[in-house]
């Protein structure tokens, strides 16, 4: 009898525990479900948001921590419309709320002020209206606040000045009114953060007072004038010869040499969150740009490791392009625009140095180097990149590039996407570097740039033939970078000729796929520790990105969705059908079609005569 009673009690205990787990686990899921129900989703981006699941951690575009608590919601550029909901304030561990570039209307909920862990709030390029909630001043960890290109009105809440962690602020293109705060965190921001609003412009700094010169007798003036004239003549003779000699020496010296100037000619100022360093400060940090501190060199110049006075490690990129007169203001403007591109997967520009003869950019130091160095130049004591890390690198770098293409105004085309330009932070998170430099180095040109900047093996065929780059140029380079991640090999390697293989990595991979040799192309350092289906999916994304026609390549935002598991199968099936049609009717090849891998011949033939800049 007792045993019979124990069974139903045990059964009910399980049900109660299950109910408790579901209720606690679904608290955050309910908040996100409320958001889903408030939004129109024509592209079915939120289709996986199933409210019956225990937690939302398996949903697309949602990231959780090890405790199954939501830390990130990525719904930028998702073609969503509707309104935000107050339940968003019930995500206690949320760090990133990315809802930019949609058609969201209504007001910003005051409850967002409850998100005390929030680091980034990106609601720009929507149609939000009403005031900026003063409750956002509670977000003491907020670093990035971008509300630009909406219809927000009213005054800027003074509570925001107390958010001392704030590094990036963009309130531009909103009908905001009133005064711009100048205290607290707002003391760092420049007019670019408040452009095209109805805010009262910041007052210009008054010029320093000029001390009046006391009058002197006429006779004294004549004597003083005579003495001054004699001194001036003597000084002219004294400095004429050295000045002529210096001018002659500069003309004879190669134009790509750098001249050091005193730090006094480059006073330290701040441009928003961007610091302007003195040349002397960077000379000391890098031991006068010593060769022993060189981290790398490439088409834009050399990169030096440096240690600032406070002990912070930095990477100093010393640009090598010839300078032209009058380009300082444009260079400074471009640098500030680059600094506004802030994303978890983009290398943050910390500061710069500009003198009449020098252009230097200062970045955080990345202790784990680049993907290329981890794949091919790691010391024996360092373990190879495992497969999960490579997957994270693929997704992180795609997110960074998608941000450059879709959410920077004007958009930034990288023009040299490769493993050497994907850096790794302390957690081996991918950080895209060297973006914006191609345009920065062309700042003195007033015409369309036709010089091809890039690296052999990564250059898209249309960019090579026309000199015109686009987002799809970057997509091609990204696809080749994925193949580097999978194979561990270089995009262009003459050593493959020894085995009668293609020197171009893309062609080599296609050849192996046609021969059904999938295992032969996977990096041997992985030692078989990967899932075949995951490798195949990453190869599929790479091949879609490296199609000959730029029109047929996906956008980087589409690549992100495919890597997150949304739409790859359909896109791949469609491409396979098109390839089969081409091979059957238009472009017969010597290779038989392989079931599951129908690969067309590469058309990206790049001659060796084109310059390459290994980084």
Curated annotation (Swiss-Prot):
Outcome recorded upon mutating residue 456 to D: Loss of kinase activity and loss of interaction with hopAB2/AvrPtoB
Effect in UniProt of substituting residue 453 to A: No effect on some phosphorylation sites
Reactions performed catalytically: L-seryl-[protein] + ATP = O-phospho-L-seryl-[protein] + ADP + H(+); L-threonyl-[protein] + ATP = O-phospho-L-threonyl-[protein] + ADP + H(+); L-tyrosyl-[protein] + ATP = O-phospho-L-tyrosyl-[protein] + ADP + H(+)
Leader peptide range in chain numbering: 1-25
Cellular compartments annotated: Cell membrane; Endosome membrane
UniProt effect for mutating residue 363 to G/A: Loss of autophosphorylation
EC nos: 2.7.10.1, 2.7.11.1
Catalytic site positions: 416 (proton acceptor)
Enzyme class (EC, first level): transferase
Tissue distribution of the protein: Expressed ubiquitously.
Transmembrane segments annotated in the record for this chain: 226-246
Function recorded in the entry: Dual specificity kinase acting on both serine/threonine- and tyrosine-containing substrates. Controls the expression of genes associated with innate immunity in the absence of pathogens or elicitors. Involved in brassinosteroid (BR) signal transduction. Phosphorylates BRI1. May be involved in changing the equilibrium between plasma membrane-located BRI1 homodimers and endocytosed BRI1-BAK1 heterodimers. Interaction with MSBP1 stimulates the endocytosis of BAK1 and suppresses brassinosteroid signaling.
Note: Interaction with BRI1 activates both receptor kinases and the full activation of either receptor kinase requires transphosphorylation by their partners. This interaction in vitro is magnesium dependent. Instantaneous heteromeric complex formation between FLS2 and BAK1 and reciprocal transphosphorylation after binding of the flagellin flg22 ligand to FLS2. The kinase activity is not required for the complex formation. The interaction with the bacterial effectors AvrPto and AvrPtoB/hopAB2 interferes with FLS2 binding and plant immunity.
Record's protein name: BRASSINOSTEROID INSENSITIVE 1-associated receptor kinase 1
Organism of provenance: Arabidopsis thaliana
Lineage summary: Eukaryota, Viridiplantae, Streptophyta, Embryophyta, Tracheophyta
Gene that specifies this protein: BAK1
